[in-house]
UniProtKB/Swiss-Prot annotation:
This is Fluoride-specific ion channel FluC 1. Keywords: Cell membrane, Ion channel, Ion transport, Membrane, Metal-binding, Sodium, Transmembrane, Transmembrane helix, Transport. GO terms for cellular component: plasma membrane. Coiled coil: none annotated. The chain crosses the membrane at residues 4-24, 32-52, 70-90, 99-119. GO terms for molecular function: fluoride channel activity; metal ion binding. It comes from Moorella thermoacetica (strain ATCC 39073 / JCM 9320). It is a multi-pass membrane protein.
Amino acid sequence: MLYLYLAVGGFCGAVGRYFLASFINRLWPGSFPLATWIINLGGCLAMGFILTYTLERLVMGPELRLGLTTGMLGAFTTFSTFSVETLHLLQGEKIPLALLYLFASLAGGLICMQTGIFLARLPLSSKALSSIITREDGEE
């Protein structure tokens, strides 16, 4: 069953990355690899949030967690594309842009991961909490 979770997550992540990258590249064409940068940072934010939330607050089986993180987010984000795009910038003698991409990706990834962890640990609002613990018939 674990392999099914990984396969479904991987499929969803890869297809999601393809469509989102295509959309971003149509909106903002240019020499800076914005689509990969946005996708990778979004994946770091989601990874920090999902891992923290499912380990600290939400009861979730390890197979589903692995399908969401390793499967979906692993396929959604892409270190290999980041590496190829950085190499193309260097080969095209766009060294300042390549260095910006490297720094923005590494620092941004760490910041987004920590932000996801922070968001997952925010206390639930009293209204949201009361709606969770109040039964359908209105009794607590």
